[in-house]
Every structure is written in structure tokens, then in C-alpha cells.
Curated annotation (Swiss-Prot):
Coiled-coil parts of chain: none
PANTHER family on file: ATP SYNTHASE SUBUNIT B, CHLOROPLASTIC
InterPro entries: ATP_synth_b/b'su_bac/chlpt
The gene coding this protein: atpF
A cellular component annotation (GO) from this entry: proton-transporting ATP synthase complex
Major location category of this protein: plastid
HAMAP family xrefs: ATP_synth_b_bprime
Pfam family, one: ATP-synt_B
Subcellular location: Plastid, Chloroplast thylakoid membrane
UniProt name for this protein: ATP synthase subunit b, chloroplastic
TM helices/strands, residue ranges: 29-47
Similarity comment: Belongs to the ATPase B chain family.
Length: 182
């Protein structure tokens, strides 16, 4: 330790003391300032291009999800059309059953009338069950498509290292901006 102190005293006496170098060219201050400005400009361009690429990717995913939604909507419309056709068939069947009931009521006895009423109500129950089944299938299909899409997007985002790095960098930049405003 004593040797280190002696070396320091020797150097300070030889150079007439310790002084601040005010020559900006010799101290490399201009070079450092230019390097800092260059790094800031390059980082801004790179970050801008990364963010614009991410934005384009997100817009593509939104368009893809919109297409899938339109497809699910189309299938839902088809199912609704089938449901309305089943209702028309049911109404037609209902009219025919009423006609049969009236014809048998006039010509047949009470037993035949009871059998037709049971057939009518069982037909209504079957139609209601089919209607509920179709609606349930459509709801399940739409929910399945939505869950598959959400799971896929979420999995890709979580697995993407660049997204995680960009999100971390973006959070740091926002925090620095927030601290700088106070």
C-alpha cells in the first residue's frame, strides 16, 4: 500500500499536480458525443422497424381472425337456415296433424283421437329437442373456434422471445419517459 502511495505522489510531482484536461479533441468528447447521437438514431430506426413489423403481424392476425369469424358466422347462418326449415317442416307437420285430428275426430272414436294427440305432442317434443341440439352444436362450434384462435395467438406471443424482449424494452422506455416527465 505504501508503494502505491509513493508511486502516486511521484507521478503527481512529475506532472506538476493532477489537472483536468480541457482540450476537447484530446479528451475525445466530440467523438463520444457523435457516437451517442449515432447510437440513438440507429436504435430509433431499428425499434421503429420492429414495431411496424409487429403492427403488421397483429393486423394480419386480426384479419385472419375476422375471416374465421366470418366463416363461423356463415356456418351459424346455415344452421339457422336449417333450423327455420325444420320449423317450416314442423309447422307443416303441425297443420297436417291438426287436419288428421279433425278428420279422425269426426270419423273415429276417442281412442284414435288420443293416439293422434300423442303423436302430435311427441313430434313437437322431438322438434324441440332437435332445435336445442342444433343450437347447442352451433354455440359449441363458435366457442371452439374462438378458443382455438385465442389459444394460438396467446401461445405464439408467449413463445416469441423477440416479443418478450420488445415488450421489456418498451416497458423500460415508457418508465424512463414517465420518470423524465416528473
Amino acid at each position: 500500500m505504501e508503494n502505491l502511495t509513493n508511486i502516486f505522489l511521484f507521478l503527481s510531482n512529475e506532472n506538476e499536480g493532477i489537472q483536468l484536461n480541457t482540450d476537447i479533441f484530446e479528451a475525445n468528447i466530440i467523438n463520444l458525443a457523435l457516437l451517442i447521437v449515432l447510437v440513438i438514431n440507429v436504435a430509433k430506426d431499428v425499434l421503429g422497424s420492429i414495431l411496424s413489423a409487429r403492427k403488421a403481424s397483429i393486423l394480419d392476425k386480426i384479419e385472419e381472425a375476422d375471416k374465421k369469424l366470418n366463416e363461423a358466422d356463415k356456418r351459424f347462418t346455415e344452421a339457422r337456415l336449417q333450423w327455420s326449415q325444420a320449423n317450416i317442416f314442423g309447422e307443416d307437420l303441425e297443420k297436417k296433424t291438426y287436419q288428421r285430428i279433425n278428420a279422425f275426430h269426426e270419423s273415429q272414436n276417442l281412442k284414435n283421437k288420443d293416439a293422434l294427440l300423442r303423436e302430435y305432442f311427441s313430434t313437437l317434443v322431438v322438434l324441440d329437442l332437435k332445435n336445442e341440439q342444433v343450437q347447442k352444436q352451433v354455440r359449441n362450434y363458435v366457442m371452439e373456434l374462438a378458443l382455438i384462435e385465442v389459444y394460438g395467438v396467446f401461445t405464439k406471443l408467449v413463445a416469441n422471445k423477440k416479443f418478450q424482449e420488445n415488450y421489456s424494452n418498451y416497458s423500460v422506455l415508457l418508465l424512463e419517459k414517465l420518470i423524465g416527465e416528473k
